[in-house]
């Protein structure tokens, strides 16, 4: 039995891991799917002050209060920043990290560096528009279809802007985790392809692929679960 902590990306919530969590639980694992502050069922906590450090603390606190000591920490998309920041504090309590189409930060980087021009424009205009959270993308653009796309579109909520503009401090916590798996989907993104090239062949890193869209936990929960179980 392995403890898995599954961290969602921007606009989503812990709910998006439902299919994968059900499969991992059925296989005998213990699964935590926290929702980051200001999103999902915690969207009522959204303020202009919710930033990257808020979300990092969300995950550090799950590890601490659930008393996890040998966990697999999984981050999707934006959560690459959250997982990397959390690893600075709790790397010793992790047996492995999996990044699913996730952004891998460098020293002093921010999500605004990795996002689309449209979102950068919205962030730049925020002081005038007064918005504190970013609208998301349609689920169909993330590889979801049919009733799954309807479900994702219904439950996604605006994402706190400050989490995109806060710059991260990383000093090698993630690299100290013994096993690291980068899972790349078929979603077109040059910066994610660059990350694959960067980690391929590096000590402790493995790379795997899934032939599905960006929201792999919805689009291909069976395939994603199989890959995550290799870390158990």
Q: At which residue positions do the language-model features occur?
A:
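Gly/Ala-rich beta-loop-alpha elbow adjacent to hydrolase catalytic centers
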Residues: 74-75, 79, 83
